[in-house]
Amino acid sequence: MQTELTRLLGIQAPIIQGGMAWVAEHTLAAAVSNAGGLGIIGAANAPAEWVREQIRLTKQLTDKPFGVNVMLMSPYAPEIAQVVAEEGVSVVTTGAGNPESYMALWKSKGIKVIPVVASVALAKRMERAGADAVVAEGCESGGHIGESTTMTLVPQVVDALNIPVIAAGGIADGRGLAAAFMLGACGVQTVSYTHLRAHETTL
């Protein structure tokens, strides 16, 4: 299935695995990427050298694109930002903060930057800052969320932006993917029970 997202990231399926803290490590990220989606390592509050190790371990398991989720409120965020640039990951997703101070560094290394946003205002700011796409995350999602539901947030962000929009929040199967397409998204980010049950997680 080809969409604007698959073409942007060089993947086969328009599905990004969410960067679940302490669950999304190298084994899960590699498995998702090998299956055709975009696997994500969740950096969470981990030290930068742990993230570096996870990136290198993922590269041993896949030659497909994968990414790192950088939680910007982490005290290690500046060091992690440098590590992902040095290690040459394909994609960075960001949450819990403003990635603008790292955008130039990542873009200079050819890294696609996809911030997670919970409002139209933040989505527009990220587009102006140079984001390649955004994840519009409804309040059904976990992590650092806003007040809008996925159903209301995604079409508003789609209408406001000229870059790809990925839907997140309450999406767990093909019906959710189809609904996201109807809302105007070009793909989804999932943190579903399907992933949580996988033997590649740390659970």
Predicted regions and their residues:
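Catalytic nucleophile loop
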Residues: V32, I166, A180, V191
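A generic structured-segment signal
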Residues: I163-I166, G176
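Flexible glycine-rich beta->alpha loop in the catalytic core of nucleotide-sugar glycosyltransferases
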Residues: C139-E140, C186, Y193
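Catalytic cores of alpha/beta
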Residues: A121-A129, A172-C186
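Active-site entrance/lid segments in N-terminal catalytic domains of soluble metabolic enzymes
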Residues: M1-A160, P164
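Glycine-rich adenosine-cofactor-binding loop
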Residues: A167-I171
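Active-site-proximal beta-strands of protease catalytic cores
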Residues: V134, G184, V188-Q189
